Amino acid sequence: MDRFQIGDEQLLRFYQLKTINPTHSWAQDSSKLNNEEATSNELGVETSFDILKDFKYGNQISIDKESRAYLNDESLSYIRDPLNGQEMSKELQHLPNDSMRLNYLVNSKQFNVKAFLRDMHKQDSFNDLNNSLDRLDSDIQDQSIHLKQLVGKNFTKYVKIKNKLDQIYKEFDEKTNEKNQCDSPKENQINVESLNKKVDEVIRTTTFKLKPLMDNYQKILNYQATKKFIELNKFYFNLPKSLKRCLTNNDFNEFIIEYSKGLTLRRRFNQSSDASQSLVIKRIWTQIENLLVTYKDLIWNSLINSNFNIDQPQETILSLFSKLLNLENFINNNQRESESGNKNTTSSSNENPILRWMSIKMNGFQNELNELSGHMISKIIHSQRLILQNNTNQDKSQGCVELSYYLKINQLFQIISDTGKDSEGLKSTVEPNKVNTISGTSYLNLNCQPSSQGLTDSPTIIEMWLLILKYINDLWKICDQFIEFWEHIEKFLDGTYQNSIINEKRKENILIGDSNIIESYQKSLILKEEQINEVRLKGEEFITSVSQNLISFFTSSQSSLPSSLKDSTGDITRSNKDSGSPLDYGFIPPNCNGLSCLRYLPKIVEPILKFSTELAQLNITTNGITICRNTLSTIINRCVGAISSTKLRDISNFYQLENWQVYETVTFSSKSQDSSKNLTFEYGVTQFPEIVTSFQEVSIKTTRDLLFAYEKLPIINGISVVSYPSKQLLTGIEIQQIISMEAVLEAILKNAAKDKDNPRNSHTILTLTNLQYFRECAFPNILQYFDDAFEWNLASKNLELFSLLSKMESSIFGNYLSDLKINLRDTLEEKFHEINWPMYTSNSFRVGDYIIEALMILIVVHSECFRIGPQLIHKILIETQIFIARYLFEAFKPYVGNLSNDGSLQIIVDLEFFQKVMGPLLEKDTEATLRACLQNCFQNDTNRLQKCINEINPIVSANLKRTAIQFAAFS
């Protein structure tokens, strides 16, 4: 068969022409363009270069030529991005080899659209890419028109030339075969084959050059199809951006609406079998699903982070739950209706969202509570150790306590009522005496709140108090948030919130017409009885944790407090019975004084009372109420015990505060012995009684406020956690009060013991005046204050306290008098025996020295007592004049019947002078004793005695006149 015998059909099929003699354009005469649309759907972008497989070698040659022509450094500088017109040299130079660079050149056969958009335009928005695509499409259309014009202009010439060449080739083949067929056909055939190969190569090269034109046309069709698809589904492609905008604007309703529309489009796409579109659709849907997860997380975070304060009312919680349930229901419906079983679809948790929210929140409260307790107890223990380290060089029992702050107790606790400054402000229950202080210490009103000015203890101790206070206040904040949170839980447990949400959904059901929506919501909203019980037990666990932390702290001792950090159950080992020492109370700073306890313990207990009452009144469980009651009972008892122990310790050491200076003057009124007139004295006392009185009153008030806290706490639904204190407890408080007042007397005795060898000084006088003030004023008023505070009758009882006080007065005063009498005795003996009474003679009869010096001793005593304790002068003079009279009575006995005449007269002068000097202060016993002494000296010769007294009166008067100034104090 002749290889050059080719028919017209073969030529038309090979060149894809309609006619063997084309005269018009390529678009009209080519048969390929007519079926391009039919084959375009079958051929993808990835297989577009498989049209002419036999040109593979030529393709590789073309790639090499492209690499040499366009990928050198000089050519790269001219390559520009077809979308934005910017240079691409920097981006292309970072690629490792030339073959990869060709993927990013739009005119290359290896151009990869996805890689080009992903790497070169990853920062561009959808609008930017859309505008660039429009611009590129316009450029390609312009170029395509130009190419079409060029092909159409030269196509006829090309076909004619090709036809002519074929005819020449055919004629050449025929002539050559006829001429050389017999001679040497084999060699001639080789030449023909060579020529055939050359012609085929020319045809192949020509077709290869035409291929880019056909490829560009295919790309144009692909771009047009892509643009049309994007424009038709613009909403779907813009959906991620729209959903982000909804989240930013908190427009959650619009979010669900937009998502629903996108879900409808997604289902429609799933029904389509176009594989080329599925990848892009899946990627966009993945972004949408991620935004849905973000929306769900946003709702959860809003619920979890809710503080439930006044800024977040009930409507907000319901709104968040409504949105969450909408989303859960939407996801569930989506899963049921999904036919593709897409694993990437957001899944809804099978757990009830309400129970899950409650569990997460309560676990959060529990963790926050444990973290707070561990952190703050650790800091409190560290502060405790610092205090102990600072006091290692001091007396562990007493010396480390700062008592100097008691000197400013009235500035630290301004509790004195202004109405108490009148004469009726202070009244003793001991009649008929009435006492009031000039400077003013008055009855404390229970409603009076002490003001806090200045430090009550050393800075290191105050620092620990503040840490404890911060711990309790932070605990209060957590409990307060839990209480507000539980109020919302209670409305879920009793169905209030569920009814509100379901009613809202019913309204939506009327508008939407979805009959299944109510049933689907009820499954998520309705809680079973066992679920409700589990929630309540979870709430009880929180109350138990709070109680354990408080009990662990308030039942610790100074030595066991560090171990409370390790013990999470609150079972701190301690002795069954407190020793009464401040060391038994680890919740107060070591060596803190009573003032700081009185200031900070009420501040610490008050928040505990409030949040414990509110926790109990939530009525979570019956056991929860019992736990709160037991916890408060323990805390109150421990705080009262701490106040009592520190008060007793400090009062026992109050003697250290005595400075022996008159602090104030007290007016004392009493009846004369014959009750004929009122005697008024003013005596001075030190600051010691006022410190004791103020401290006692503040202690009583603070203790009373703690024990009677129920008066200030509300009772809701019949639930109260603090009740009226028991009689046993009040009896214990009464005993502690009496013990503390006895400790005052012990402190006074400690100072008095220092002067027992030299009692005649101002310290003894001030001690006696202080004791008198305690007996007549301070103690009665303290007892009356106690009775008013606790509705008790302590003041009416016959307490041994006052007997002990009187014995102390008598003992100290007796010691003072004993020393004075010894001094008088020594003086009298010395001067009395200097006179030779049997041989005594005198011309002037001046008062004897023994009388003058004895009276001078009394003058000194008068001077000592007059400013500090004038009420003591009378008692001292009574005792001393009787002592002097009795001493003289005994001293003159040996001389009875053995006195000279002048000696007898001298005795009359001395004794009459002594009586005249004493004047109104002269006691009848003294006068009778001295009269008996004179009668003994005159051997009971009363006539002679009276005659001598009358005769000697002028001499006595002269002596009185001469010593009037010297002894004016007695007049």
Curated annotation (Swiss-Prot):
This is Exocyst complex component SEC5. Residues 123-182 form a coiled coil. GO terms for biological process: endoplasmic reticulum inheritance; exocyst assembly; exocytosis; Golgi to plasma membrane transport; protein transport; vesicle docking involved in exocytosis. One of its GO terms (cellular component) is exocyst. Present with 3400 molecules/cell in log phase SD medium. Residues 558-577 are annotated as: Disordered. Signal peptide: none annotated. The exocyst complex is composed of SEC3, SEC5, SEC6, SEC8, SEC10, SEC15, EXO70 and EXO84. It comes from Saccharomyces cerevisiae (strain ATCC 204508 / S288c) (Baker's yeast). It comes from the Eukaryota. The modification Phosphoserine is found at residue 184. Keywords: Coiled coil, Exocytosis, Phosphoprotein, Protein transport, Transport.
